[in-house]
């Protein structure tokens, strides 16, 4: 029992690529400063199908963060999903619970993206900012959209692909941009190593009253 309690717990991040991520450095410094017997690793897997191999190879792995492009792709591999994550349709946190047998593993998915985004954007929401444009339609976009609607903000989705639920960048007019005072980049554009890329958005229509939020932190 003592050896089990003293065993260093392992946590990590799955995604591809991971060259832009500072999660490993951040969490390992946090574990050390808080005197937590744990380690954080990056698992740069090229296919989500490699997830179970990672879990089998590291028996002390207790949890994972999930980043692009697997926040939606990981769903079929989960044993259960938190209600909020289920409503969002994307997961960025996995809790790993192991039973007595090697193949007895339970994976429960959660979404903390929506919590972090909501807390950071809420102080800037006012009566003049009741409509938002969210650029992108992936897992990050779903979390952002969920959070904005929780704050009572109307959301317009913008994508390169036209659909019944989205507008394309070519369709955006000055009046539409002016009406939506919150603009969120939830696309992977700008992510390392392609840091000079950005959405094909009509930036000339932005004004001083707009709140622009970029999820790409590098």
List each language-model region with its residue ranges.
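Rossmann-like adenosine-cofactor binding region
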Residues: 165-218
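Gly/Ala-rich phosphate-binding loop of Rossmann-like dinucleotide-binding domains
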Residues: 145, 149
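Conserved beta-strand elements of the Class I
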Residues: 12, 131-135
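N-terminal Rossmann-fold NAD(P) dinucleotide-binding loop
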Residues: 141-142
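Phosphate/diphosphate ligand-binding glycine-rich loop within oxidoreductases
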Residues: 4-124
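NAD(P)-binding Rossmann-fold cofactor-contacting core
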Residues: 150-169
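Glycine-rich Rossmann-fold phosphate-binding loop(s) that bind the pyrophosphate
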Residues: 16, 136-138
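Short helix-loop-beta connector
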Residues: 125-131, 207-208
